[in-house]
């Protein structure tokens, strides 16, 4: 998605060899207009997939997932990283490792929110090692829901997350694919949605 790549070039900050800071529009401050365009793009790509629910994990996946759900006219559900007192019913539970935070979190979704046979589009902010996405896939398997696709806002193609998801037979759409960081700049690989630009 050229609009997203341009924004990464303008406001993204490369930290070291493997971190991209995008807190000016995605991971801290949210540019709702950009998120709306991202949501529309995911909805375009998966328009014929029969999506019944959009699922993400808190926190930075919520904005793009919400706009994708709005464009598809379906509910959006986010997996919570901390159980609260109102989550006292049956839970779908798994553990995910965060590459950026360097920690493992237990994530959960109320089992009554995902029904057997639901066709789920998983959306997340970043794809690095694939752990968050695979964790959400595992939650959907527990619910006997079908994952019809995974939409990633930004993918670090130099890490192994993409291959892990493809090896699982998943349909993957990344709107910005980073081939590498070079001299503090982002070098992009062709995005999966290039036909829509």
From Swiss-Prot:
Homodimer. Pfam families: Pribosyltran (PF00156). The keyword Transferase applies. PANTHER family: HYPOXANTHINE/GUANINE PHOSPHORIBOSYLTRANSFERASE, XANTHINE PHOSPHORIBOSYLTRANSFERASE. 5-phospho-alpha-D-ribose 1-diphosphate binds at residues 128-132. Keywords: Cytoplasm, Glycosyltransferase, Purine salvage, Transferase. GO terms for cellular component: cytoplasm. InterPro entries: PRibTrfase_dom, PRTase-like, Pur/Pyrimidine_PRTase, Xanthine_PRibTrfase. One of its GO terms (molecular function) is xanthine phosphoribosyltransferase activity. It is found in: Cytoplasm. It catalyses: XMP + diphosphate = xanthine + 5-phospho-alpha-D-ribose 1-diphosphate. This is Xanthine phosphoribosyltransferase. The keyword Oxidoreductase does not apply. Its EC number is 2.4.2.22. Pathway: Purine metabolism; XMP biosynthesis via salvage pathway; XMP from xanthine: step 1/1. It comes from the Bacteria. GO terms for biological process: purine ribonucleoside salvage; xanthine metabolic process; XMP salvage. It comes from Lactococcus lactis subsp. cremoris (strain MG1363). Xanthine binds at residues 20, 27, 156. Belongs to the purine/pyrimidine phosphoribosyltransferase family. Xpt subfamily. Gene3D superfamilies: 3.40.50.2020. Converts the preformed base xanthine, a product of nucleic acid breakdown, to xanthosine 5'-monophosphate (XMP), so it can be reused for RNA or DNA synthesis.
């Amino acid at each position: 998605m050229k609009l997203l790549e341009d924004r990464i070039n303008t406001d993204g900050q490369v930290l070291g060899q493997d971190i991209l800071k995008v807190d000016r529009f995605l991971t801290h401050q949210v540019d709702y207009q950009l998120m709306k365009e991202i949501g529309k793009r995911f909805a375009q790509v998966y328009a014929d997939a029969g999506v019944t629910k959009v699922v993400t994990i808190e926190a930075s996946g919520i904005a793009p997932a919400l706009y994708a759900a709005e464009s598809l006219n379906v509910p959006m559900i986010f997996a919570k990283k901390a159980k609260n007192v109102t989550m006292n019913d049956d839970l779908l539970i798994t553990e995910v490792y965060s590459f950026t935070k360097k920690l493992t979190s237990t994530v959960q979704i109320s089992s009554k929110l995902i029904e057997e046979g639901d066709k789920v589009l998983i959306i997340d902010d970043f794809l690095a090692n694939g752990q968050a996405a695979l964790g959400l896939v595992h939650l959907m398997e527990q619910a006997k829901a079908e994952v019809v696709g995974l939409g990633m806002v930004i993918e670090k193609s130099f890490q192994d997350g993409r291959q892990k998801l493809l090896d699982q037979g998943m349909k993957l759409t990344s709107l910005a694919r980073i081939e590498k960081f070079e001299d503090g700049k982002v070098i992009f690989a062709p995005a999966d949605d290039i036909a829509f630009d």
